[in-house]
Amino acid sequence: MSLKRLGFQPLACKRDMRRPELNRDSGWLIGVDILVVFLGLIGQIFLSRSLLSADYGLLIILLDAFATIFILVDAGLPTLLNRDGPKAPGMARKAAHRILKLQAVIALPFIAIAFIGSTVIWGDLPFGLLGICAAITLMHVASYPHRSLLRCLGEARIEAMTKLLERTVTTSLYGCLMIFGINEIHWWALAFFIGAMLGLISAIIFGEKVGKNNQGEGSLPELWNSNKSLLMGALPFAVTLGVLPYVTKLEKFLLSYFHSYEDVALFHVAQLAWLAGLLVPQGVRAALLPVLGEARTQEQLITRMSKAQSLGFILLPVGLFFGHVLVSNLIPLAFSNDYVQAVEIFEILLAGWALTLLAVPWYVGLQAGPHPWRFTGLLGLVVVSAFISGMLLIPEYGVTGAAWSSVCGSAVMFYASRWMNRTKLPQQIWLDVSAIICLATGYLLSTGNGLAWIGIITVIPAGFSIVEIRHQMKNSEEE
């Protein structure tokens, strides 16, 4: 099926080429990601109702463990393409090919490490199950170069559709397995494998088609001149990616060590809803990185960061309200009684979601700036703080302690990213007020306290931000 029939018409003419744009691209990424997460939640409901809690928790740990290993194959290279590609659209496709070749070489030692490590830790499990789980995470990593290619060429909408295709196929296959009463864990892993494979194939096909039709002047930075300089330039992002999985997976690893796979499954259900909401700041981040990377002056950088901050203020009360209402009703309705406590855990995680959303302009500014190692250091601080708090809280308080450990990591990201970036943006007072209000709201919601309604205060900076964005749009039209 052609892109034109789907309504996507990437044009070769330079004046008609799409460029990265924050509101449009984040709208596509967030909008489709909401559908992806909705389908993902349905898939998790199928999983939790068809597999024993122990098997469900085991599958989660297997996928998380392989993802933690193979994310290093990424080497930070697609992030570089996402940052530098908008400056040289005519060279972006060749850059994606180059990244894939480098990643194929990098993957070899990590495949060996994964094979040896998995057979030692889970030697009693079928090799086929381990192989399927490993292949799933490898295919996800292999899809990143072409998805970054699409995004840096202004086609975040097509990137989003490849994700939707993958999740639709996976969830549909999960539904078939549930209907036929299949409860063997390897069949469910195979369904995920098929979805990931189709997601990879679609990303490559559409990325190649869009890349061929893009022309444009400009050249990639000097670090792209050789593989050595390219890998060194991507090293901060590679180290970051090595740390990044622990930001969302560390608590589950600690729970599996100190408690049980059943507790991992309970925390995972709560975290699913949290990760669903986390796609909002991730969508803004994904759209903001090429926009900041394209900024030529400090004034442009501040203007674009300020716009992202305003967007965060607007999304904050919406996320708090709908997150609480939807999850508090959805989890008891969709999951068995074994997972009812996940609502309380989610309310705690909701505070961490808010802090992550508010931190987006600052940590993306670090990522796109001249000192990307600062972003690596930031994530290192987040993981260390989450690990220390997890070691203190999880052995004693279990799943609840894991939730507060996650919030501690988000709080460190919020405050440390602002301190490390040091960019001055408007509404700083409201930023601090919103953070404190969100922390209090998460705690009060988790305890069932009616004072949780103080979260409505976040509507005030949202109103100011709407006025500011309208003013910016009016000035843009006049120009």
Predicted features, each with a name:
Residues 6-18, 131, 157, 185-191, ...:
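Interhelical loop/hinge segments that connect adjacent transmembrane helices in multipass membrane
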Residues 3-9, 21-78, 111, 115, ...:
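Signature of the first transmembrane helix
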Residues 73-89, 152, 270-310, 363-368:
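Helix-loop junctions and terminal segments of transmembrane helices
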Residues 2-6, 73-74, 97-125, 132, ...:
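Alpha-helical transmembrane segments of multi-pass membrane transport and lipid-handling proteins
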Residues 25-40, 166, 170, 191-211, ...:
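Transmembrane helical elements of multi-pass membrane transporters/channels
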Residues 84, 139-162, 293, 350-381, ...:
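Membrane-interface junctions at transmembrane-helix termini in multi-pass inner-membrane proteins
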Residues 24-36, 62, 67, 71-119, ...:
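Membrane-water interface segments that mark the loop-to-transmembrane alpha-helix transition
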Residues 101-240:
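Hydrophobic transmembrane helix module of multi-pass membrane transport proteins
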